[in-house]
Structure formats: structure tokens, C-alpha cells
């Protein structure tokens, strides 16, 4: 709690790229865009099907060439202004000027404000994925004049190289978040190998001035379970069975049991998700690994230990 405000602070390992309409390269930036901006539709968390967002519902003509999106009447921008259909229309036209979005909505012939509370899409050809496309983060709508002002559950109040702060939007049109503020503390030095940052003690957050650091007392601390995915980039240099051999080496060779880290700090998982178990393949002996592989990873120091042991194990298989 900060000033009677429930606040979540997230130490983050890299500076965040500026938010802008359309496609964003980083997953963190994509997630932030989804919290700051809203689209005409959104994906239901349970079914992953598009449902109403800025539009409470929509209708499609029998030939599939006309889509009418009916807007909610209580929409407000983060600056308090009421949302008008003309605002959304302007921003949609701006998005269609972006090459990637122009391809995403290549079926759209034109967009019109056919009623003060209705936006209508006229299509060149039927596109029954239109509601899905509009639910994507890259199709979310910012104010046409202020690209960092949206209608999402959080509004952006600070964006610097060291701190990104979001505060809840009091006039949000859907269910309000429990948190009033979220802060990304950009602290890349804490995640460098030379700092010795461990997953047991990733970061300490202290509220106050630097000269008060010696007098502060701990309020709370804890360790929560985490996970780490190993993804294998599809390439002509790495066959399916070669990829399976790498996975099998990690899970079945006893490599994890030989790591010089705390007991049970790194263990093999048996499923990616509940009910989605990792298969155990019997890799044929004739399967040989490529001569070289590149492993990319970040934080914490336990993963450096893991990477070094994996490197030595793969080297014994003829892979550097």
C-alpha cells in the first residue's frame, strides 16, 4: 500500500519501448497496450472468442459485407472526455494507414459513422474473422489526437527510462481492476550476471530516500514458485528428432540433479500445463545433434549454472 493505494511494483530487466498504435515488438509492450487501450471487441478469457468491448454487440449482414458495431453510451477517455464515434472512426482510419494493419484489414472497403453510436464496416469480400482481428492488441484504439490516451482499465501516468506507472481508470466501462496502480521499476543492473542476483532474492524494494536505507526494516518477504520454458526455434538446421534429443537430455539424463544450486531449486517439470504432459521420447541412437547450437537466456544466476552444465553435456554429444 502506498498512500492508501494498493500498488503492484514489478522489477523489470530492460527498458520498455515507447507505446505506439499498431504492432509492438515486445510482449511486455503488447500487454501494456492491452491494459491502456480498448478495442471494439475483445477476447473472452474463458473461450478466447471475441465479445463486445467498446461495442456492446455487433450485427453482420447476410452477405457478410456489412458489419455494424454498436457502441456503449458510457465510454470515457482517460482524460475524462466522452468517447465519440467520430474519435474511434478517426483512429481506425489512422491505423489502416499502417502497412501491417492495412494487410490485416485488407478486406475492409471503408468505415463510416452511420449513427452517433454505431460504426459500420463495409467489406470488399466477406471476412468472418473481422471481430477476431478487431480484438487483437494492435487494433486497440487510442485517442486520435493523444496517442497515449486510451479507454482501457489503466491509464498511463508516467513513462520514463526508470519507471512506468499505470493507474486505474475510474470511468472504465467494464469490470474495474482490484489494483489502483501498477509500476514497472526498470532495473537492468539487478539482472546482470556479475551482480549475482539469485532467484531466491531477485530484488529488494525500499520506499524512501537513499540516506534512510540503513534505518529501514523489512516489512515482508517471500519466495514463490516460478517456471522457465525452453523453446526451440524451428530451423532447417535442427530436425524434429534433434530437438527431441535436446529435451530428452535435459529431462532424462540426470543433468538437473547435478547442478550446484540449492536443493530442489531447479527441477524438471512433467507438464507444460495441467493435463498437458511432456512426452518421453525414445530417441534413436543414430540421431546426432548439430555441430553448434546457440542458447539465449536471461536471469537468474541459477540459469547461468544450468547453461554451463548444459553446454558441457551437449559438448560431449559433439555439439558446441
Q: What is each of the regions a protein language model found here?
A:
Residues 171-213:
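Ligand-site clamp/hinge motif
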Residues 101-145, 153-158:
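Surface-exposed binding/hinge segments that line
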Residues 80, 190-203, 308-317:
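Short helices/loops that flank or line small-molecule/ion binding pockets
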Residues 223, 235-277:
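Periplasmic-binding protein-like
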Amino acid at each position: 500500500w502506498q498512500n492508501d493505494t494498493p500498488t503492484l511494483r514489478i522489477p523489470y530487466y530492460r527498458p520498455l519501448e515507447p507505446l505506439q498504435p499498431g504492432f509492438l515488438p515486445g510482449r511486455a509492450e503488447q500487454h501494456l497496450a492491452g491494459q491502456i487501450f480498448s478495442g471494439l471487441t475483445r477476447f473472452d478469457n474463458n473461450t478466447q472468442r471475441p465479445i463486445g468491448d467498446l461495442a456492446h454487440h455487433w450485427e453482420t449482414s447476410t452477405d457478410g459485407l456489412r458489419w455494424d458495431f454498436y457502441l456503449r453510451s458510457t465510454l470515457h477517455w482517460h482524460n475524462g472526455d466522452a468517447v465519440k464515434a467520430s474519435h474511434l472512426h478517426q483512429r481506425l482510419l489512422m491505423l489502416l494507414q499502417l502497412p501491417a494493419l492495412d494487410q490485416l484489414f485488407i478486406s475492409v472497403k471503408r468505415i463510416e459513422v452511420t449513427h452517433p453510436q454505431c460504426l459500420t464496416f463495409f467489406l470488399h469480400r466477406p471476412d468472418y474473422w473481422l471481430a477476431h482481428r478487431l480484438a487483437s492488441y494492435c487494433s486497440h484504439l487510442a485517442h486520435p489526437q493523444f496517442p497515449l490516451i486510451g479507454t482501457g482499465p489503466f491509464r498511463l501516468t508516467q513513462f520514463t527510462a526508470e519507471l512506468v506507472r499505470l493507474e486505474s481508470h475510474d470511468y472504465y466501462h467494464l469490470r474495474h481492476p482490484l489494483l489502483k496502480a501498477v509500476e514497472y521499476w526498470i532495473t537492468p543492473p539487478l539482472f546482470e550476471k556479475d551482480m549475482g542476483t539469485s532467484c531466491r532474492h531477485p530484488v529488494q524494494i525500499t520506499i524512501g530516500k537513499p540516506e534512510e536505507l540503513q534505518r529501514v526494516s523489512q516489512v515482508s518477504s517471500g519466495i514463490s514458485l516460478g517456471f522457465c520454458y525452453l523453446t526451440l526455434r524451428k530451423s532447417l538446421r535442427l530436425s524434429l528428432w534433434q530437438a527431441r534429443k535436446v529435451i530428452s537430455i535435459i529431462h532424462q539424463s540426470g543433468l538437473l540433479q547435478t547442478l550446484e544450486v540449492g536443493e530442489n531449486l531447479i527441477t524438471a517439470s512433467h507438464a507444460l500445463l495441467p493435463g498437458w504432459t511432456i512426452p518421453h521420447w525414445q530417441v534413436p541412437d543414430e540421431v546426432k545433434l548439430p555441430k553448434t547450437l546457440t542458447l539465449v537466456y536471461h536471469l537468474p544466476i541459477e540459469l547461468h549454472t544450468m547453461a554451463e552444465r548444459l553446454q558441457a553435456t551437449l559438448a560431449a554429444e559433439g555439439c558446441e
